[in-house]
Structure formats: structure tokens, C-alpha cells
């Protein structure tokens, strides 16, 4: 039924339950705590949904104005690694081409009052993107942080 929604409003059709959207209502999924929640409360749960659109390629940049006009999106999250690959320089997330593309997204999104997020590998990158205006910063991953802590601990024993 998603094809019935206006192209720009598809995310909201997915997010919201009746009467505003067409979100599935199966109570036996994770969102419903595998049926461990009150069946009527579940239908109200679309009020508690956080919509994060991931911008990870050239198409996202090309369609950014349209994306920025979608109502109800809470966060635009830039995926720097996938974006770098889409730009033809895989893994080079600090390459000026990638950085400038990301800065453009941040500027345009902030001009529309949108919250922007991204992933960073280093404390230096975190500081840089924070200064640029990114409000939601995801640093490393749990396993990476754990490995770094183990390496530091091991060094302290030497």
C-alpha cells in the first residue's frame, strides 16, 4: 500500500498508524515487545517513533531538497563511509570531496531547521563535526570502544 502515498510522504506512511499512515500493526514483533505490551497501547505507539533518514549516497545529495521537505523526519543521518563509496573514494571519509559534500548537507539541512547526525571514528572528527553544526554524533561502535580500552589497559601492564 506504500505506493498509495505521495512519494515525499512515504516515510510518514510507514511510521504512523491509522488514520495518518499505514504502519503495520502486528503485535508479535520487537516494536510490540513480542506481544508483551497492551494491544491497545501498541496502536498509540507511533507517537514514540523516532524517524532517522540515512543519507548515504549521491542520490541523497541530488534529492536533498525533496528529502528536506518531508514532514515528520526527526534526524537526517549522514553515513560517511557509504557516501565516500558513492562518491568514488571508498573509505576516504576525510577526503575534501566527502567532507565538502557532508558540509553541504549539514548547511542545507540546518537552514530548514533539521537535526543532522553522522558517524565519526576519532575524537578529532567528533570535535570537527560538532563545530560544523552536527548535533547527533555517533562515535565508533561498542566493540571498537571495548578493543581500544583493552589496548590501553594492556599498555599499562607493559
Each PLM stretch: what is its role?
Residues 18-20, 46, 94-116:
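Alpha-helix-loop-beta-strand connector modules within alpha/beta enzyme cores
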Residues 51-56, 76-78, 116-118, 137-139:
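Hydrophobic faces of well-ordered beta-strands that scaffold small-molecule active sites
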